[in-house]
């Protein structure tokens, strides 16, 4: 009876990251397991039932086997067939592969959920950053407008206060003469306007003419009366 072909274990080794044990490979091949040092004959014999070439008899007190080892050695070689052990090993391997596939599916689903959560967190961070930038821009604009308005109000109040103080301040050295001279200069600029100095000159000339006329009239009367 031919054995089924041995499955390729390289994919399993790559997924698990470790090499498949030799005992599992031998069990899949249908080979008998290699006995360990403790399972061998302590007296150097072959472990069979013959007494000729063993160098030690089973009835000897120095080479007596424990009951568990003797029972296992008597039942293990002939109890199970290689075909049954091979099928049981394949079933165990398929079960482990199925569990491994399920774990990989669960890991992928978890990875997808984590990626979605990271995307949501990233979008939230970007929206918060945008809101902070917009708020900073609006605040800077409002502060600049309020600063310009305050500076304008301060300049207006300062100019009005300065003009009011200049009007009501008598310590600037102005007197009536300086004000009159200033008014005279303004009147010179206006055509046809007579200044107080012009009026004074007019009144002086009229008085002189009147006095001259009064002095001339008696002379005429005296001359008239003389000739008469």
UniProtKB/Swiss-Prot annotation:
Q: Which sequence ranges are marked TM in the entry?
A: none
Q: Which UniProt keywords apply?
A: Acetylation
Here the segments flagged for biased composition (Low complexity) are: 57-88
Give the compositionally biased regions (Gly residues): 44-56
Q: Residue spans with biased composition (Basic and acidic residues)?
A: 8-21, 28-42
Region ranges (Disordered): 1-89
**InterPro entries named in the record:** LURA1/LRA25, LURAP1
A Gene Ontology biological process annotation? positive regulation of canonical NF-kappaB signal transduction
Q: Name one Pfam family in it.
A: LURAP
- The UniProt record lists the keyword Acetylation: yes
* Keyword Acetylation (UniProt): yes
- The N-acetylmethionine modification is found at 1
Q: What is this protein called?
A: Leucine rich adaptor protein 1-like
From which lineage does this chain's organism come?
Answer: Eukaryota, Metazoa, Chordata, Craniata, Vertebrata
What is the gene called?
LURAP1L
């Amino acid at each position: 009876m031919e054995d089924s072909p041995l499955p390729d274990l390289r994919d399993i080794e790559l997924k698990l990251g470790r090499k498949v044990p030799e005992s599992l490979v031998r069990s899949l091949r249908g080979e008998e397991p290699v006995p360990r040092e403790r399972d061998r004959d302590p007296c150097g014999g072959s472990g069979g039932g013959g007494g000729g070439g063993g160098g030690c008899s089973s009835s000897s007190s120095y080479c007596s086997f424990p009951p568990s080892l003797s029972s296992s050695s008597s039942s293990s070689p002939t109890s199970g067939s290689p075909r049954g052990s091979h099928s049981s090993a394949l079933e165990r391997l398929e079960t482990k592969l199925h569990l491994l596939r399920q774990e990989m599916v669960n890991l992928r689903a978890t990875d997808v959920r984590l990626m979605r959560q990271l995307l949501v967190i990233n979008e939230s961070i970007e929206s918060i950053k945008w809101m902070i930038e917009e708020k900073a821009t609006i605040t800077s604009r409002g502060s600049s407008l309020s600063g310009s308005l305050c500076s304008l109000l301060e300049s207006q109040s300062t100019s009005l206060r300065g003009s009011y103080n200049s009007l009501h301040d008598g310590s600037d050295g102005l007197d009536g003469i300086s004000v009159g001279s200033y008014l005279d200069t303004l009147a010179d600029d206006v055509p046809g306007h007579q200044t107080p100095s012009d009026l004074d000159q007019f009144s002086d000339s009229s008085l002189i003419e009147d006095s001259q006329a009064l002095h001339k009239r008696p002379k005429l009367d005296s001359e008239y009366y003389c000739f008469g």
